[in-house]
Amino acid sequence: MMKRVLIITYYWPPSGGSGVQRWLKMSKYLPEYGWQPVIYTTENAEYPIVDPSLEKDVSSKVEVIRRPIFEPYTFYKKFLGIKKEETVKMGFIEEKEKKKSWKTDLSLWIRGNLFIPDARRWWVKPSVKYLKSYLKAHPVDAIVSTGPPHSMHLIAMKLKEELGLHWIADFRDPWTEIDYYHDLHLTRWADRKHHRLEKEVLTKADKVVTVAPDGAKRLGRIGNRNVRVVYNGFDRDDDATTTVVKPEKFTITYLGVLSKIQNPEKLWEALEEVTKENYDFANKLQINMIGQIDSSVVKVIEKRGLSLYVSYSAYIPHDQVSAVHRSSTLLLLLLMPDSEPRAKGLLTGKLFEYLASGRPILCIGPEDGDAARILNETGAGTTVSFGNKEKMKEAIKTLYNKYLEGNLPNNTSPAVEKYSRRNLAGEFAEMLNKVKS
């Protein structure tokens, strides 16, 4: 008999971006392992990215419950004079190099000190009230909360306390160790409250899961417990209708959000030098930057004289992503410098979709990090630390020569398949079975 799992998630189609992918795909494959997902999500959320193409990925076996949510962003936009159609950055954090007005600073202070743990805190009480009634009429065998936003964990924690349900807390990103946490102008009181709630979630959940080994260690230290890793992954179904266009040029592609801290300045230097040293390379070079690219990155690219090689595009629907990957010569994975505390454990969702493409990957990040280990294990690419310009040049020139020879690597290693969404859903189902027993 099919078991039922309630999944509490803020991000759900038509939301686009990385936050929606994990549980959209997990819910698609969990029924194959005997678990019917019941999604509890919002009906009127203000998502920073909207992607209607993802609606077709919602399995017919998934029950979806949508409930209204109060979003403070409407007031935030009015206060700052932001147009209604413009999106608000995660955490209300604006680019650091922009001069901030007193209104921006005040809004940031309110976000950090009154919206604890985040701006969806007002959804907790009405959600608990609704779900208590729903679950009495429609029992489930387990619940999963996924954050951020971490308010989702508070809903699940209350349900566990009041109904005694088995609960798995899924951390797609950290809480108090998230990159922008220290930009929130927190008072001592607010900082203590964030840490208290985080520890409460980590200690009260029956199981805690996250997306990378380093992140599991960090959460484990906070909660004084073992934290399980279930990676993000790729869905082979995304490739089913992919039309691959062989690139006319040596095409380097980056797809996703690129922040100031991820800006690989030595890579742009390396590319500048190779274009000056090799006229043929300069003629054949094409760089595609797709997604939300921080202005600081654009400035460095301009400074290095690379603008004529670069094409910028906004967010593209997820059903076009696979074709873009497979129509590229080289895929860029840009993490963080080794000096950043989270750098070694950063495993973005794009890594796994890059793996599925079979195209060579150049990762700029810690050479002893989690991403580097996966690239080595699968033979899918090379990792170079942020400061090693010469190694970057060597990697680019080696791949360019293979491109000229028509001998580009096309990774088909069986090791890649362990990161398929279907396999990872099986791992999560195994954990659900253990929690229930």
What is each residue range found by the language model?
Residues 1-74, 207, 227, 430-437:
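N-terminal subdomain of nucleotide-sugar transferases
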Residues 284, 289-291, 296-322:
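Nucleotide-activated donor-binding/catalytic signature segment of Leloir-type glycosyltransferases, i.e.
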Residues 129-132, 151-154, 158-162, 175-176, ...:
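Membrane-proximal helix-turn-helix segments that form the acceptor-binding/catalytic region
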Residues 42-121, 125:
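A conserved catalytic-core segment of Leloir-type glycosyltransferases
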Residues 214, 230-233:
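Carbohydrate-associated surface elements
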Residues 244-271, 424:
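Conserved donor-binding/catalytic core segment of Leloir-type glycosyltransferases
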Residues 72-78, 234-249:
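Acidic anion/phosphate-binding donor-loop and adjacent secondary structure
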Residues 206, 311, 325-344:
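Acidic donor-binding loop of glycosyltransferase active sites
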